[in-house]
Amino acid sequence: MVQQESRLRVADNTGAKEVLTIRVLGGTKRRYASVGDKIVVSIKDTAPNGSVKKGSVSTAVVVRTKKEVRRADGSYIRFDDNACVLLNAAGEMRGTRVFGPVARELREKQFMKIVSLAPEVL
């Protein structure tokens, strides 16, 4: 469960390490984002030779949350951290690799590129 001002780890190789959530996309009164939801983020911490700059604004999709996500079969899935993957203006991945596991809910929300590049889909 990610909301405004939440800080997330970046799970791709764009060079960003940490981002701050500016807005949860999907309506004016939308407060929380879960796995598969799009958010607007500001890059707060970067690697020295990354493709993104500190302070730049980007869109991202949440791939892991500490708050559990309930599935249709009654099971729950939760992760050890909150993480996202940066997207370009067209809604495609900016990076070429994904680090760490991602949730199966991304497949249902049509983020096939992220699912195919992830080392593990839970």
Swiss-Prot record:
One GO MF term = structural constituent of ribosome
What CDD domains is this protein classified in? Ribosomal_uL14
Q: Which UniProt keywords apply?
A: Ribonucleoprotein, Ribosomal protein, RNA-binding, rRNA-binding
Keyword hit for rRNA-binding: yes
Which is a GO BP term held by this UniProt record? translation
User: What is any one of the record's Gene Ontology cellular component terms?
Assistant: cytosolic large ribosomal subunit
Tell whether Ribonucleoprotein is among the UniProt keywords. yes
Could you tell me which InterPro entries the record lists for this protein? Ribosomal_uL14 (IPR000218), Ribosomal_uL14_bac-type (IPR005745), Ribosomal_uL14_CS (IPR019972), Ribosomal_uL14_sf (IPR036853)
Q: Which family does it belong to?
A: Belongs to the universal ribosomal protein uL14 family.
Give a short account of what the protein does. Binds to 23S rRNA. Forms part of two intersubunit bridges in the 70S ribosome.
Protein name as catalogued:
Large ribosomal subunit protein uL14
- Species this chain originates from: Flavobacterium psychrophilum (strain ATCC 49511 / DSM 21280 / CIP 103535 / JIP02/86)
Q: What is the lineage of its organism?
A: Bacteria, Pseudomonadati, Bacteroidota, Flavobacteriia, Flavobacteriales
Report which gene this protein is encoded by.
rplN
